[in-house]
Amino acid sequence: RLNGNSIYDQPYGDRNEFPCPDRLGSCTMTDEDYRSTRKGQSLEVFDNLYEAKQHLNFKPQLPSGLEGLRSVHVSIVDHDVLQVVYAYHELLKGTYFDRVDDMPKYIKYRVSTLSGNIAGDYKDYLPQKTEVVNDIIVTYRMVDDFVYLASWEHGGQNHVFLFNEPVSVERAREMINSVGTN
């Protein structure tokens, strides 16, 4: 479980929450945008997904069946956005990491029945790409040819994946396909 000062404990739009990825030329956010995303937001942290689900008024669709994906932080933002931070590493064997090379990548997943931008990420991106994955329209925000953010709506729920290290479109597709009600 991450401590209370973690970036994962911050609600929407914290300037330090989503640093500009390498190789990204345009990454801006105005003070006005920043202030408007920070008004009166709450964040409630839970010990596990089961506990968090009891506090939602919907049954969230979540990623499952992906090798090496472990939830490390669970919270609800503004009472109706479930946020799960996953640690991911190809060689993840357990909870502890022996070498710096073994440090995981972090993936933030948010799901809600709210429409609109639930990512909390308001920077400008070039390029943006849209594709259809299993009859679902997915929008990617890209860094070079890699995905930094993927968002889509399905089954009355709004979904977002944010990757602290951009991933291939194929990997993003695999993760999107893993999301279902469980």
Where are these regions (language model features)?
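Short, solvent-exposed recognition patches
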Residues: 2-155
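Surface-exposed amphipathic alpha-helical segments
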Residues: 155-182
